[in-house]
Amino acid sequence: MSSHKPVRPNEALHKEALEELDAKINEAKKRFNEHKEKLGAIRGGGSLQEKNAELRAELDNIRNAQAAIRSSKQTLINKVKAQDELLKKKVKELTAMKKTVPFKSEVELDKHVKQLQAAVDSGTLKIVDEKKYLREISQCNRTRKSFVELNALQTSIDTIRNELNELRDQLNDSESKKLSDKFVEIRSELDEVRKQQDGYYKDQRKLIAERDDEKTALDDLYNQRRALQREYDTQLRAFRTYEREQRAKRQEQFRLERENREKEKRRIAAQRKLEEASIPAFTEEILACENLLKVFHVPVESSTTNAVSTGNTSSKILKPRTLTPRTVDPIPEGTIIKKESSDDAMFSGLKKSKPKKSNKSNNNQADSDRLNLSFGTIKEFDFVGVPAPFTKSQVDSAVEQLKSRIAHFKEQQDSVTKQRIEKAKQEIEKLEAKYNSKEEKTLTEADMVISSEETVTVTNDLEVEATA
């Protein structure tokens, strides 16, 4: 990698230069295609030859249409005569039918029927006149059917007349005139195409030389465009490579810093775990037993305390156990405490009576033998696995058990401490192995990502070059 930082190429300027070259290429390509077209017309190809064939095909179609018109005229004349005779016959039938109908239209018939019906409904007519009007109304209704036949006949006449007009229009020579005009127009275009082809034949050598010159100029422009695109791609590839390498360096630096931090954390955690495991086993139990012996004023040689205090950091990890004093909730202010004489009898299960002197002496003896221990002291006895004494007579047994527990703890202390240290070392080794495998997997994934980025970059560059 070069020492200086590559500069990213200006994409806007590059596109502007490409557009300028593309415009020149399009102009050169247009001139080249024109010369190629002229040579193709001379050699029997190109647009002029195709146009010549199209014009000839149109002339053939016009000739066929004119021949068909000439052959079909006689048939049209026969059809016109037949339709004209049919029209005259229908008109005569319509005229004869109208003479049989006394009314000009159906509207006039309806008006007359309404007048007759109004006269009948008025009730002022004589019976003879009324019968006459009714017969006339019936006759009018029968006449109404004749109007239906008249309308149908009139529709048929209109249809025949329209068909006759169409046939007469076809007999006119306007279509033939249009075809003739079209024939002359196409013939003129065909003559013009032939003149152009004749001119191309005369200048064939000149056209070939001009075409070769245009081809050379076009190839030169294409080479300029490829060189410009290649230079841009090279600069862009160098810039991307530099950026990728810088990003990889930053990622590697971050990874090393993170790895160092993780190593330091693991070292401190492993050191703490080993220090905790190196604390002599049963230290808290032995301290608890010694504190309990001190409660009963038994002299104790605290070798465990001295061993703990000689360590570098063990004394910071292990805190001395203290006996929690018994606490009593305070009585709210203003509370009146009242003792009833029946309470003793209730809880003792005896009848309410005046206690005898002998019972009083026994109670005093029991109170003097009772041993009051705090709740914290009782919890310490439970912690070391020794029953707590609740009378003075049980103190000696509890002291012996405490001494026995201290001896047992000290006897097992070295072996249990070694086991704890060995177990802590194994746990540290497992954690280190797990971290190393995880770190290797992370590095492999990072290498795969960088490799894929390089592949994508190379592929994009190749696509750009292929497009250019």
Swiss-Prot record:
Region of interest (Disordered), ranges: 324-369
| Keyword Signal appears in the UniProt entry | no
In which domain of life is the source organism classified? Eukaryota
UniProt KW Cytoplasm keyword: yes
Which UniProt key words apply to this protein? Coiled coil, Cytoplasm, Phosphoprotein
- Where in the cell? Cytoplasm
An example GO BP is: mRNA metabolic process
On this chain, the residues bearing Phosphoserine are 342
InterPro entries linked to this entry: Bfr1 (IPR039604)
List the GO cellular component terms.
cytosol; endoplasmic reticulum; nuclear outer membrane-endoplasmic reticulum membrane network; ribonucleoprotein complex
Where in this chain does the entry annotate a coiled-coil region? 10-94, 147-279, 399-445
List the GO molecular function terms.
mRNA binding
Identify this protein by name. Uncharacterized protein C458.02c
Q: Tell me which species this is from.
A: Schizosaccharomyces pombe (strain 972 / ATCC 24843) (Fission yeast)
